[in-house]
Amino acid sequence: MAKWTELQDKSFLEATARERAVGIVDEGTFTEFCGPFDKIYSPHLPLMGEAIEYDDGLVAGVGKIGKKPIFVISQEGRFIGGSIGEVSGAKMVKTIQLASDLYEEMVSEKPDLPEEMRPAVVISFETGGVRLHEANAGLLAHAEVMDQIQNCRGRVPIISLIGSRVGCFGGMGFVAAATDVIIMSQFGRLGLTGPEVIEQEMGKDEFDASDRALVYRTTGGKHKYIIGDCNYLAADSIRSFRETTTAVLQKPMEEIETFRRIGSMEKIKEQIELVKLSVSLKPKDSMDVWAHAGNENPESLINMTLDEFLAQAKRLKA
Amino acid sequence: MEGMLNELNFKFKSENPVDVVLPKHHYGVVGSGDLEVLLKKHELEGAVEIRVVSPVRGFDHVWEKVLEKVISDAEVGNVAIEINDNNATPVVVALRLAQALSEAKSAEQSVN
Amino acid sequence: MQKEKVWDKLSTDTEERMNAANELFSDRKVVPSQNGVALLEAVIRAGDRINLEGNNQKQADFLAECLGSCDSEKINNLHMVQSAVPLPIHLDIFDKGIAKKLDFAYGGPMAAKVAEFLREGKLELGAIHTYLELFARYFMDLTPRVSLICAYEGDKDGNLYTGFNTEDTPVIAEATKFRQGIVIAQVNKLVDKVQRVDIPGEWVDAVIESPKPFYLEPLFTRDPANITDTQVLMGMMALKGIYGEYGVQRLNHGIGFFTAAIELLLPTYGNELGLKGKICKHFALNPHPTMIPAIEDGWVESIHSFGGELGMQKYCEARPDIFFIGPDGSMRSNRAYSQTAGHYATDMFIGGTLQIDKYGNSSTATASRVAGFGGAPNMGCDAKGRRHVTDSWLKCGAEFEDQAALLGDMPRGKRLVVQMQETFKEKMDPSFVEKLDAWNLAKNANLDLAPVMIYSDDLTHIVTEEGIAYLAKCRGLEERMAAIRGVAGYTEVGLSADPKETKTLRERGIVKTPEDLGIDRSRANRSMLAAKSVKDLVDCSGGLYEPPARFVNW
C-alpha cells in the first residue's frame, strides 16, 4: 500500500477499504481490529465454493484525528459488492460498541473530558447491503448496527462517508440515513432499493438502471446534497474526506445532532414536509426538484466542477 | 479448508534467497479476478511455503509454474505465503505476488 | 423479325414501382411515417436485393421495423446486403421469411443469432466481408435495388443532412441511385432547409420523419475507470517498443481498452519518452473520447473518422483544425473514405483480438458467434497496392526477413500490424491456442473458410504482458512460432516454449520483455493515465464532451 502522504491525494472512488481506513485518520495512528492475519472469515462462503477474504470485506480499527479517538469502519466493494455477512456485520457492530464503551469509560473517569478528546465513529460505506449468501446473519447484523447507532445518540458522533464505486444501498442505506452526518462526493450514491432492483420490480419505463445519468441524478452526491440527504460534498480524494470529517468533528455534539435527518419530533416534521412537497410537486425527474430549490438552469449543474457547483447550487428548504 | 474451495500447497527455494524485512505483510483485495496475499517471515531454511485457496480447479500446474517463477525472480526465502484467490489470471497472480514481495523486501515500512 | 432491344428496363421498373406508391406521399418526396410499411410494400418486390443501412454505430431502425412489418406473403426471399446486423429486428426479418439471403460485414450483438439462423436454415449466407469489401461489391455484383437509409435532417426535395454520422450513407445512396434503384430515407427531422446537403435530393426518392431519432451505439467509448494496471503496462510497452521504436505517425487504433490506455498514456508516459511530434500525428479513427487529453496536449494534427461517436459532436466541432468539419461547422464522417485512408495511408494498425493461434493467425469469432470483420482487416493488413514511402513503413520493410524469399533483393516497405492481448482473458480463458475457435464456427455455421481477422503473414508484432514479439524480424514460420511461444505466458502454447530458444530470441531482439525494454513494472499502474474517469474526460474537454447516459457516474 502507498504511504499515508501518498494516500491523501488518492481518488476516494478508487481507494480500497484499507486505504480509506488508514488515510482518513492521522498518519501512523491506525490499528486494525480482526485484520487479515487474524483470519476471521465467513464460514458460509467455502460451503458454496465462493472465494473468501480474511477480513471478510470489511476493515475495522481505531486511529486518531488530533486528540480524538476515531473508530473506523470501511467496507470493500470489490469483495462480493461490499455486502454485509455474519463476520463483516459483527465487526461493524463491535467497533461501534467499542467506541461507545470507550466514551463511557473516559467520561465516567473524567466528566469534564474536553470535546476534542471524545471518541467518534467514521463509516466509509461501499455496499449493496445484506450478503445474500448469508442473509439471516446479515439482516441480524443490520439490526444490531442500528441498535448500536441509537445507543451512541448524543454521545458518540457517527459520520458516514460515501464516495466509493458501489455506493451505499439496501439495508445499509437505512443505516447511513440513521447516522449523524453524511459526507459524499459527487461520485457517491445513496439509496435504499438499488437501481437494478427497481427496474426489475417496476419495469424499465419506471426506472432504467442502464441509464447511469438517471441513476446518478437520482441517487448521486449532488442530488443528495441539494435535497439535504447529505450534509457535505467533498472532493474525490481521501484528503478532502479527511478534512471535511475533521471540520465536522470540531463541532460540539449538540450541533452535530442538528445535522441528522431523523431522530426527533422536529426532524420528523421536516421529513413530513418533504413528503408533502413531493406530493404537490409531482417531480418527473430530480431536475424538477433542483429547479424547485431555486436552481434556474438545473441541468447546467450536472457537469459542473465541484467548486462551481458548491458556489452556485441552491439547496432545498423544507 | 472445508467445503468446495480448492486448496493448493507448494514449497519452492530460489538460488540466492534473501529474507524479507517486514515480519508480516498483507497486500491486495479478493475482488473478481483478483486476490489477496499474506506474507509471514518464517524460518524455512531459505525456502518459501505457499498455500493457495481458490474456487478454481484444473489449473494446479499453472499455479505451480507461475508461483515458482515469481519466487525465483524475487529471490526471497524464509517466508510463508497465503493467497486467497478469486479467479485471478496468471498475469494478475504474478503481478500481485511480485508487488507484495517487493514491499515486504523493502526497508521502507508502509502504513500497515 | 428481330425484337428491338430494351436498355432501360431498370428505370422503367423503378418508375412503375414509384407510381404504385404515389398516393402515399403527402408532399413532394415526403411520406408520413404511418405510410412506411405501405411504401415498402409498394416499391419492394419479392427476391429484391435490399440494403438496410446500419453499421456498428448508426441504424436505420425505423425502416427496419417497417420492413419487418411487411406482409411476407407479398414480400419474401429478399437478399439483404448491409454493413451490419446488430439489432434484433434485423434477424426478425429473416425469422418471418421476409428475407432469405445475407451479405454483411459485422454481426455485433446478434452474432450468436446469425450462427443459429445459419444452422437452422433460416438464413442463407452470401459472404462475411470487411466494410470496404462490401462497399466495393455494391458497385460490382451486389448493387441494391432498394436502399433504406437514415439521416439527421431531410427536406421536401429529398436533400439529406447526415452530418457527424454520415458513415455509410454516401456509398449506399450512390451505388443504388446510379443503377436506377430506389432510395428511401428515414430522418430525425423534416426541415425547410437542411443544415448542409450531404446527399443531394435527386438521389433520394422518399423521406420519412421517423417517430424516434435513429439508434446510435457509442461503440468507441471506453471508460478510463475500467482500464487495468496490466493494460497500462502493455500500453507502456507498445509506446516504447513500437510507437517510439518505429516513429509511427499515421495510424489507426482498434476498439478496446489496450488502445484506450495508450491514448491516455500519450500526455504522460509519451511526453516522458519525448515522443510528442514524433508519433501519433495523423489518425483514421472515430472520435474516441479517450483521445481528448492527447489532442488537448497537442499531439494530434488530424483525425478523419469512419463514423461519429455519441457525445463527441460539440468537441469535434470546436476543434476544426483536427477533425474534418464542413462549411456549416459540423463534422462529416465517411466510412468508405476513412477505411481507404486506413488501408492505404496508415503505417500501423494496432488493436486487441480474442484468440491468436500458434502460427499468429487471430480471430474474434467463437464457436457459436458469427462476429464478422467490420473494418479491422482492411487496416490490419499490408496494403499491397501502396507505393508511397514513410520512415516507419520502410523500417518495418527492411526488417521483414521473409520478404527476400519472394522479392529477391528488391526492397519494399511493410505496414506494422500489431495485436495486443493478455495471455489469459477472464476465467482463465487462454488467448493463445493451438487451433482457433473459428474452425469450429466454420463447421457449425457451414462457412467455406474459418473467419480470420488478421492472418499471420500480415501480422508484424504481438504485445502481451510477457513481452513484445517482433515477428517481422523472424526467419521462417518455425522462428515466428517460437517468438509467439515466447510471449504466450502460461497458456499451453506458452508452456511449450523452450527457455533456451526464447533466450536466444531475446538476445536477437525478437522477443523483448518489459525489462528488456527498460520499463519499470512497478510504475505500470492507473496513476500513469492522463484521465482516470469519464468525468476527467469531460473536464479535460472544457465541458464540450457530453458522454452518453450510460457512461455518466456523477
From Swiss-Prot, chain A:
GO terms for cellular component: cytoplasm. Keywords: Cytoplasm, Transferase. Its EC number is 2.1.3.10. Residues 2-257 form the CoA carboxyltransferase N-terminal domain. Disulfide bonds: none annotated. GO terms for molecular function: acetyl-CoA carboxylase activity; carboxy-lyase activity; transferase activity. GO terms for biological process: carbohydrate metabolic process; fatty acid biosynthetic process; malonyl-CoA biosynthetic process. This is Malonyl-S-ACP:biotin-protein carboxyltransferase MADC. It comes from Malonomonas rubra. The gene is madC.
UniProtKB/Swiss-Prot annotation, chain B:
Its main location: cytoplasm. Coiled coil: none annotated. Pfam families: ACP (PF06857). It comes from the Bacteria. InterPro entries: Mal_deCO2ase/Cit_lyase_ACP, Malonate_deCO2ase_dsu. Keywords: Cytoplasm, Phosphoprotein. It is found in: Cytoplasm. GO terms for cellular component: cytoplasm. Covalently binds the prosthetic group of malonate decarboxylase. The modification O-(phosphoribosyl dephospho-coenzyme A)serine is found at residue 32. Belongs to the MdcC family. Subunit of malonate decarboxylase, it is an acyl carrier protein to which acetyl and malonyl thioester residues are bound via a 2'-(5''-phosphoribosyl)-3'-dephospho-CoA prosthetic group and turn over during the catalytic mechanism. This is Malonate decarboxylase acyl carrier protein. The lineage of its organism: Bacteria, Pseudomonadati, Thermodesulfobacteriota, Desulfuromonadia, Desulfuromonadales.
UniProtKB/Swiss-Prot annotation, chain C:
The keyword Transferase applies. Alpha subunit of the biotin-independent and biotin-dependent malonate decarboxylase multienzyme complex (EC 4.1.1.88 and EC 7.2.4.4, respectively). Acts as an acyl-carrier protein (ACP) transferase component. This first step in malonate decarboxylation involves the exchange of an acetyl thioester residue bound to the activated ACP subunit for a malonyl thioester residue. Has a weak activity with acetyl-CoA as substrate. SUPFAM superfamilies: NagB/RpiA/CoA transferase-like (SSF100950). Pfam families: Mal_decarbox_Al. One of its GO terms (molecular function) is transferase activity. Its EC number is 2.3.1.187. It is found in: Cytoplasm. Keywords: Cytoplasm, Transferase. This is Acetyl-S-ACP:malonate ACP transferase. One of its GO terms (cellular component) is cytoplasm. It is an enzyme of class 2 (transferase). The keyword Lipid metabolism does not apply. It comes from Malonomonas rubra. It catalyses: acetyl-[ACP] + malonate = malonyl-[ACP] + acetate. Optimum pH is 5.5.
